Amino acid sequence: MPSETLWEIAKAEVEKRRCHGSDGDGMEIGEKSVFFIGSKNGGKTTIILRCLDRDEPAKPTLALEYTYGRKTKGHNTPKDIAHFWELGGGTSLLDLISIPITVDTLRTFSIVLVLDLSKPNDLWPTMENLLQATKSHVDKVTMKLGKANSKASSEMRQRMWSVMQKDHPDRELIDPFPIPLVIIGSKYDIFQDFDPEKRKVICKTLRFVAHYYGASLMFTSKSEALLLKMRGVINQLAFGIDKSKSMCVDQNKPLFITAGLDSLCQIGSPPVPDSDIGKLQAHSPMELWKKVYEKLFPPKSTSTLKAIQDPARDPQYAESEVDEMRVQKDQELEQYKRSSSKTWKQIELDS
């Protein structure tokens, strides 16, 4: 009997993995995916490059970017592969969230939400819009997965709650994000010079949001020590390296809190006088924290937040021939609009 070809061996391996995955018996996934979302110009690309040891300048992310990294577990073992996705444009391209997260990839995914601490007025709407859009899509995909593979869907729910110990006092008061979530506050070097009361509100608010969603929370900057900590957190998501158990909740220092280690008791109540809490009329703890936060940091208009420069006019992506043709077509379009407008006016006059 002739030996199998390389193609036949590869095909058999794929079929074996597919069958193994459909059994839903707690398979260990070798390839993982990390999806970076967050503030526009918040430092997502820089974080990815740092995690991958790539010494190259960070370029603005136009829409949805992809890259990957490899890591060797040990001698003579195949390298683990991690897929890195990045959503550009802040909150302006929410529709693209659905592209990388599918039924086939859902169980490999983790989310990293990068928030620019130097722009506190944009922080809540950016966080809220991105998390809501991501959760909505993940919930839909999870439902599809449940119909095709109920055991795998059940395992995802168990993993979702595994960040919180069974005897944790807040277990009944939180709503874990459906897939692993890390919240990174970037540009701490600017944030540390803020007024202490403003820092206190931002720190307590982010601690509450992270705890409510069962997420890890950390602040980072250009500091080498903070970058190493951040890299360790991302490597844990991408390659399954052990979680750090260290913790820092001092608002005068960069926060570092692993998922499940914080508590509502430690976080405390929203930083507002007790006499004002009753006036806020919130229907949930999350809404209460939002109202308190936005009282101090009123959000800018949504149109400002969603504004994005026309990539066709960005000099970074200049293409002389394409740009000349674009100008010509724009002129033709304007002429057509004027011509059509005259035609309709003439029809109205004739009638």
From Swiss-Prot:
Region described as Disordered: 304-335
Cellular component terms per the entry's GO annotation: apical part of cell; axoneme; centrosome; ciliary basal body; ciliary transition zone; cytoplasm; cytoplasmic dynein complex; microtubule
UniProt-listed GO biological process terms: cilium assembly; determination of left/right symmetry; intraciliary retrograde transport; intraciliary transport involved in cilium assembly; regulation of cilium assembly
Basic and acidic residues bias (residue ranges): 323-335
Main location: cytoplasm
Keywords per UniProt: Cell projection, Cilium, Cilium biogenesis/degradation, Cytoplasm, Cytoskeleton, Developmental protein, Dynein, Microtubule, Motor protein
SUPFAM superfamilies membership: P-loop containing nucleoside triphosphate hydrolases
One Pfam family it belongs to: DLIC
Compartments where found: Cytoplasm; Cell projection, Cilium; Cytoplasm, Cytoskeleton, Cilium basal body; Cytoplasm, Cytoskeleton, Cilium axoneme
A GO molecular-function descriptor: dynein heavy chain binding
Keyword Iron: no
Domain of life: Eukaryota
InterPro entries xref list: DYNC2LI1, Dynein_light_int_chain, P-loop_NTPase
Function (record text): Acts as one of several non-catalytic accessory components of the cytoplasmic dynein 2 complex (dynein-2 complex), a motor protein complex that drives the movement of cargos along microtubules within cilia and flagella in concert with the intraflagellar transport (IFT) system, facilitating the assembly of these organelles. Involved in the regulation of ciliary length.
Similarity annotation: Belongs to the dynein light intermediate chain family.
Subunit record text: Light intermediate chain of the cytoplasmic dynein complex 2, a multisubunit complex composed at least of eleven different proteins. The cytoplasmic dynein 2 complex consists of two catalytic heavy chains (HCs) and a number of non-catalytic subunits presented by intermediate chains (ICs), light intermediate chains (LICs) and light chains (LCs).
Protein name: Cytoplasmic dynein 2 light intermediate chain 1
